[in-house]
Regions:
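Surface-exposed coil/turn segments at beta-strand junctions on protein surfaces, enriched
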Residues: 1, 66, 78-80
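Beta-rich globular "head" domains
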Residues: 1-35, 84-92
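Short, exposed beta-strand/loop patches in secreted or surface proteins that constitute
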Residues: 34-36, 58-66
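Glycine-rich, low-complexity segments
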Residues: 37-55, 90-100
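Secondary-structure transition/turn motif
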Residues: 48-52, 74-81
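Noncatalytic modules at the cell exterior or secretory-pathway interfaces
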Residues: 65-75
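Domain-scale recognition of soluble eukaryotic interaction modules
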Residues: 70, 84-86, 96-100
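Mixed-charge, glycine-accented linear interaction segment located at domain edges/termini
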Residues: 76-80, 88-95
Length: 100
């Protein structure tokens, strides 16, 4: 039985493409949450903010999730836009002998 606090800081910058907006459009994201491993079953509770953006960034987002026994981060951009993504994810883990 484990609880893991995570904080994900992500930056997306448009570097090309023919869709609306322009090269250099950007958006930043901070997502925080807790993943619980309860007897081998993972669950996640999280919230996300976007502290800064410029240009056309509608629909862009990182998504932190769990699948099976894995923590995942996927990203979603927009049609006809080339976007580069960088992310730092910090995790703090607490293992306990009690049932969560």
């Amino acid at each position: 039985n484990t609880a893991v606090y995570f904080q994900s800081e992500t930056l997306a910058v448009r570097v090309g493409g023919s869709g609306a907006g322009a090269v250099g459009d950007f958006k930043s994201f901070v997502e925080r949450g807790v993943v619980i491993n309860k007897s081998g079953t993972l669950s996640i509770v999280r919230s996300r903010t976007s502290p800064a953006s410029s240009g056309t960034t509608t629909g862009w987002s990182p998504i932190n999730s769990v699948s099976g026994t894995n923590f995942l981060q996927t990203v979603k951009g927009a049609n006809n836009r080339d976007i580069e993504w960088v992310s730092t994810i910090r995790m703090t883990q607490l293992k306990t002998g009690v049932t969560l």
